[in-house]
Amino acid sequence: MQPNDITFFQRFQNDILAGRKTITIRDASESHFKAGDMLRVGRFEDDGYFCTIEVTGTSTVTLDTLNEKHAQQENMSLDELKRVIAEIYPNQTQFYVIDFKCL
């Protein structure tokens, strides 16, 4: 069985599969992905594979520069997005946006 390249919390699986979540915001440890990469996607909780995505672009962002477009691409409100990012990555301010499409 092939290993997964990237994982998402299970609560995001349906939004990814339905095309409602089209970006992910990660820390420096996952800043190496680039446009054109095909990634096997698994659930964080059990590493179970659930789809393949294509990276369509990357950019950098800070907690302060997150905006409504980012929130829309994450399928949540801006306040919720900032809260989730702060919970997942406490004490960090620089992040990497990975734009993707589900294949």
From Swiss-Prot:
Gene3D superfamilies for this protein: Hypothetical protein (2.30.130.30)
Domain of life of the source: Bacteria
SUPFAM superfamilies: PUA domain-like
Transmembrane feature ranges: none
Gene Ontology molecular functions: hydrolase activity, acting on carbon-nitrogen (but not peptide) bonds, in linear amidines; N4-acetylcytidine amidohydrolase activity
InterPro entries: AC4CH, ASCH_domain, PUA-like_sf
Claim: Hydrolase is one of the keywords in the record: yes
First-level EC class: hydrolase
Gene Ontology terms: cellular component: cytosol
The protein's Enzyme Commission number: 3.5.1.135
Record keywords, A-Z: Hydrolase
Domain ASCH as annotated: residue spans: 6-94
Pfam families referenced in this protein's UniProt entry, alphabetically: ASCH
Reaction equations catalysed: N(4)-acetylcytidine + H2O = cytidine + acetate + H(+); N(4)-acetyl-2'-deoxycytidine + H2O = 2'-deoxycytidine + acetate + H(+); N(4)-acetylcytosine + H2O = cytosine + acetate + H(+)
Residue numbers annotated as active site: K21 (proton acceptor), T24 (nucleophile), E74 (proton donor)
UniProt record similarity statement: Belongs to the N(4)-acetylcytidine amidohydrolase family.
UniProt function note: Catalyzes the hydrolysis of N(4)-acetylcytidine (ac4C).
HAMAP family xrefs: ac4C_amidohydr
Annotated protein name in UniProt: N(4)-acetylcytidine amidohydrolase
Taxonomic classification: Bacteria, Pseudomonadati, Pseudomonadota, Gammaproteobacteria, Enterobacterales
